[in-house]
């Protein structure tokens, strides 16, 4: 996993002030870098992965965030809520049509924040996601970027088996590329990422 999730979170909240805002959080079913501790007025977690949302709901209850978080199981393009900001966390590149997703986001909130992989990140090569990331980066360029900041982290794995487990859902090409690390231990793969305000 990334070397320091706290650093990723700190970079996010330093880039954009979420305090007092209603945030439509797209892709919230995975691990969350943004939570109510950022001072949000309301955090609306949106994801279509029901299993991931069940885990998120349990986490919300365990942390006592029931009054500050709402969970919506939906395809993002079907969401008709409004807020101050739409926040995509490492998921815009997974959208079928990133341009359409950004256009829909603009109808829901005046600000759009995207936290995602940089097109030149080595990590996306091993995840076999370079085409998807390039497509979402091009969509953001066309949409109009107000500001951006680039960061560097590393994905670290104890061994090749742990790396393969992380890449399991990425397809055959990712598994083939990961063979470069067969037999290796203490694997570190550079992960460049960006936070953008659209």
What is each residue range found by the language model?
Residues 28-30, 132-198:
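Conserved Class I S-adenosyl-L-methionine
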Residues 24-78:
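Class I SAM-dependent methyltransferase SAM/SAH-binding core
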Residues 99-112:
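A short glycine-rich, Lys/Arg-flanked "PGG" loop and its adjoining helix->strand segment in the class I
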Residues 65, 95-96, 109-110:
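Helix-to-beta-strand junctions that scaffold the AdoMet/dcAdoMet cofactor pocket
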Residues 1-21, 30-35:
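Conserved alpha-helix/loop element of class I SAM-dependent methyltransferases that forms part
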Residues 20, 82-84:
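Local beta-strand N-terminus motif with an aromatic residue
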Residues 84-99:
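A short SAM/SAH-binding and catalytic strip from SAM-dependent methyltransferases
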Residues 113-142:
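Conserved class I S-adenosyl-L-methionine
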